[in-house]
Amino acid sequence: MKLTCMKIVAVLFLTAWTFVTADDSRNGLEYLFPKAHYEMNPEASKLNKKQDCAAGGQFCGFPKIGGPCCSGWCLGVCA
């Protein structure tokens, strides 16, 4: 009985602590991702930089996905 009461109190305490320490409890996760999107620096992203890639039809070596080809497909030659 005492253990059950302690568990209930602990869960209520942790739930209250989560809401108290949240950054913006009014909006929750609704505006979390758009805010992060606008704060992101697109020029710092390595995904946008494909300068060191080989064009289609050039030799790329062993067949693999995500290789040196601009398309990301290496089948002996860039696809």
UniProtKB/Swiss-Prot annotation:
Q: Which cysteines are joined by disulfide bonds?
A: C53-C70, C60-C74, C69-C78
> Which of UniProt's keywords are assigned here?
Cleavage on pair of basic residues, Disulfide bond, Knottin, Neurotoxin, Pyrrolidone carboxylic acid, Secreted, Signal, Toxin
Q: Which residues form the signal peptide?
A: 1-22
Question: Where is it located?
Answer: Secreted
Q: Pyrrolidone carboxylic acid-modified residues are where? A: Q51
User: Which Gene Ontology CC terms are recorded?
Assistant: extracellular region
Query: Carries keyword Signal?
Result: yes
In this entry the propeptide is located at 23-48
Q: Which Pfam families match?
A: Conotoxin (PF02950)
Stored InterPro entries: Conotoxin
Q: What Gene Ontology molecular function terms does this protein carry?
A: ion channel inhibitor activity; toxin activity
Q: What does the record say about tissue specificity?
A: Expressed by the venom duct.
**Similarity annotation:** Belongs to the conotoxin O1 superfamily.
Q: What is known of its domains?
A: The presence of a 'disulfide through disulfide knot' structurally defines this protein as a knottin.
Q: What is this protein called?
A: Conotoxin VnMKLT1-01122
Q: What organism is the protein native to?
A: Conus ventricosus
What does the organism's lineage look like at the top?
Eukaryota, Metazoa, Spiralia, Lophotrochozoa, Mollusca
